Amino acid sequence: VVGVRCMNVGGLGMDVDVLVRCKKGRFVKGKIKYLLSLLQSLFTFKGYEIEIESGERRETHKALIAVACNGTQIGGGIRICPASVIDDGKIDVMAVECMGKAQIVKAFLYLMKGKVLDYPAAEHFLCERVKIVPSLPCTVQLDGELYDGLEFDARIERGLKMYR
């Protein structure tokens, strides 16, 4: 992603909103801090208007979450894109539509179970390069690190050898 390396997952959405809230929280520590931030986000997050561009493909979303993945998991083991294969030379793009408060909770439950690809408002595709353009500036995360004002233009760099 423009000037910053990302090995696993980069994106924006409610997951980033939770991380931003955790970073701001001062009085509570550990898992409780994360859970409180998550609860706040579940009830206040409104989604991001974004455009996803990849080759000839152009689509707009009101995204609960939008990610470009090489790996399968974010955070403490949340399987954001179970179909992702780290050594296939492709970026897995996942976008989940934000469709109201009740649906946010439902989508989150699919996410926590690792079944987000089964969620009706989730979209997944493979590509070699993707741009995710929010209508307003927002914070993005790359491998869990937060960046403000970063242009999200991701591509696969070849060269890393994977041994299993």
What kind of region is each of these model predictions?
Residues 26-33, 76, 82-103:
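Gly/Ser/Thr-rich active-site loops/lids in small-molecule metabolic enzymes
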Residues 9, 20-21, 68, 96, ...:
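Short beta-strand-to-turn element immediately C-terminal to the catalytic PLP-Schiff-base lysine
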Residues 54-56, 60, 85, 95-164:
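ATP/nucleoside-binding phosphotransfer catalytic cores, i.e., glycine-rich phosphate-binding loops
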Residues 1-64:
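Catalytic core of DAGKc-family lipid kinases
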Residues 15-18, 60-62, 74-77, 101-104:
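Short acidic/glycine-rich loop or secondary-structure boundary segments that cap or lie
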Residues 36-39, 48-55, 76-81, 115-118, ...:
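Glycine-rich, charged/polar anion/phosphate-binding loops
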Residues 11, 15, 67-81, 146:
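Glycine-rich phosphate/pyrophosphate-binding beta-alpha loops
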